[in-house]
Each structure stands twice: as structure tokens, then as C-alpha cells.
Regions:
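Active-site region of the double-stranded beta-helix
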Residues: 1-57, 72-118
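Histidine-centered metal-chelating micro-motifs
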Residues: 60-61, 65-70
Length: 118
């Protein structure tokens, strides 16, 4: 309940192996209870402000570029279904935002999750 997803912030908008692959991503969000809400952040460049989108139950968002973590309000649960459309034939390789990449060492299980995308 409450918290962040997609953090450390990452992107996958450029084919430049072995660092990153190009995959567009579509999310459909659900909240429990259904009157809950959240926010989808979109930051196109590290160190510069970006956009934020208010999410409600049933929101769908399509992302083709930028770092994109999301968060849910405290006391609510957020579920999402995501579809990745690869513009190359390779598995997903996420590029983590340099200013937050050190968090990869502090979040239990994150490296195991990343390994499953390959």
C-alpha cells in the first residue's frame, strides 16, 4: 500500500546495446479501492524537470521515451498491466537514471527482477 514502482527511474527509448534497447510501453492502471489514485512521472532528461500525470482506476498511458517511475497514494494499492513493444528483436535492457542508479544496490530483489527481462 502506497509507494513507488519503476524505481530506480529507468528508460528504454534508444537502441544502443549493450546499455539499452528501444521498447515503447503501454500501462493500464487499477486501484484498490477503486477511488484510489496515483501519479506517472515522465522525465525526458536526467537533472531536468519533467511531466506528471494523475492516474485513476482504468487510466491508460503510452510512453515512448523518458524515465518513468510511478507512485500510488498511501493507503491504496495500485496494480498495472504493461505491454512492451520492442522496436528491435532483442529482450528488454533498461537504462537506469544516472542520478538514482546507486539505488540498485539498496533495493532488495531489484537485480533479480532486472535479470528476468533478459
Amino acid at each position: 500500500e502506497g509507494g513507488w514502482s519503476g524505481f530506480p527511474s529507468h528508460k528504454h527509448d534508444t537502441d544502443r546495446l549493450p546499455l539499452e534497447t528501444r521498447h515503447d510501453e503501454t500501462y493500464n492502471f487499477r486501484f484498490k479501492p477503486s477511488h484510489g489514485s496515483g501519479v506517472q512521472m515522465l522525465q525526458r532528461e536526467d537533472g531536468k524537470s519533467g511531466d506528471a500525470y494523475h492516474l485513476v482506476d482504468g487510466s491508460t498511458i503510452c510512453l515512448d521515451s523518458g524515465y518513468h517511475p510511478c507512485a500510488v497514494l498511501p493507503g491504496y494499492q495500485m496494480y498495472y498491466f504493461t505491454i512492451l513493444g520492442g522496436l528491435s528483436q532483442r529482450s528488454l535492457v533498461q537504462y537506469f537514471q544516472p542520478s538514482h542508479a546507486d539505488q540498485l544496490e539498496t533495493i532488495p530483489g531489484i537485480k533479480d527482477m532486472i535479470a528476468k527481462f533478459k
